[in-house]
């Protein structure tokens, strides 16, 4: 069975593999998007690879990719990744917690950035306390900043919210999943983000209460695999990609929460062979 279940009617999205998803986000490949990491490890090891465009016209939906090679075993695994832009009025772009069940640290999502030149920084920490960081510069064209948002865009009220849909690209390519294999999981959700911020006299002012997704929990069977802490810097209608290493057949489930206490969830079975 290759269809996911949710509490609303599902719509097809992104008919293609991982490369097609990157193209949709404006990045043809992780290699093109990410030069050698500019950061250096604080305690040894290799820093994360950070992929994002050098220049973008649309700061409301900037693709960000984070990948890191690190053991993912119970006694030694990459535990968390933070994405930050200290120059922005919403500095934190998210905090992402992983477990050995992820198999590999890979994360792709879309964030809001202010216009002008700035630097996006990724900090990573493993279960033994080692830390790494990588920083890359980006320029958002003048007038293209995505941090303002005091009011909902016309036609984008709460009625435009839809629960998530889970997609497993490997199954769509007709390739079976094997026990212990690391696979991509893509989650698409229709949900607007309102930062509540406006710029007046060159200063950012909070005008209204923000409305946004605050978190995402990923479960496989009864165990929580990942916990993502989200912020108003997340783009509208996000597409989030992460990895999973299923050792047994089971059900992958995602649960989003927003700033008004609502939960939106979906599930998808994983079968081998």
Predicted segment positions?
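Short edge beta-strand/loop segments characteristic of extracellular beta-sandwich folds
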Residues: 63-71, 184-190
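Extracytoplasmic/periplasmic copper-protein system
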Residues: 34-42, 133-169, 265-273
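N-terminal secretory signal peptides
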Residues: 1-8, 19, 23
């Amino acid at each position: 069975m290759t269809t996911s279940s949710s509490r609303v009617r599902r719509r097809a999205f992104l008919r293609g593999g991982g490369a097609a998803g990157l193209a949709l986000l404006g990045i043809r490949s992780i290699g093109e998007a990410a030069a050698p990491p500019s950061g250096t490890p604080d305690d040894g090891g290799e820093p994360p690879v950070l992929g994002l465009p050098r220049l973008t016209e649309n700061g409301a939906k900037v693709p960000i990719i984070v990948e890191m090679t690190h053991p993912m075993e119970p006694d030694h695994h990459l535990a968390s990744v933070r994405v930050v832009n200290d120059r922005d009025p919403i500095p934190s772009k998210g905090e992402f917690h992983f477990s050995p069940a992820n198999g590999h640290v890979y994360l792709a999502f879309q964030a809001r950035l202010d216009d002008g030149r700035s630097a996006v920084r990724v900090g990573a920490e493993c279960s033994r306390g080692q830390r790494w960081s990588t920083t890359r510069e980006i320029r958002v064209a003048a007038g293209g900043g995505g941090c303002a948002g005091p009011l909902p865009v016309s036609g984008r009220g709460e009625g435009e919210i839809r629960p998530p849909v889970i997609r497993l690209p490997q199954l769509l390519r007709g390739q079976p999943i094997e026990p212990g294999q690391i696979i991509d999981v893509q989650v698409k959700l229709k949900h607007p983000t309102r930062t509540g911020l406006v710029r007046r006299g060159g200063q950012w002012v909070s005008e209204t209460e923000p409305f946004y997704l605050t978190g995402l929990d990923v479960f496989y069977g009864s165990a929580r695999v990942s916990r993502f802490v989200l912020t108003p810097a997340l783009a509208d209608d996000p597409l989030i990609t992460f990895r999973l290493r299923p050792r047994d057949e089971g059900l992958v489930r995602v649960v989003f929460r927003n700033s008004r206490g609502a939960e939106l969830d979906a599930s998808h079975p994983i079968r081998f062979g």
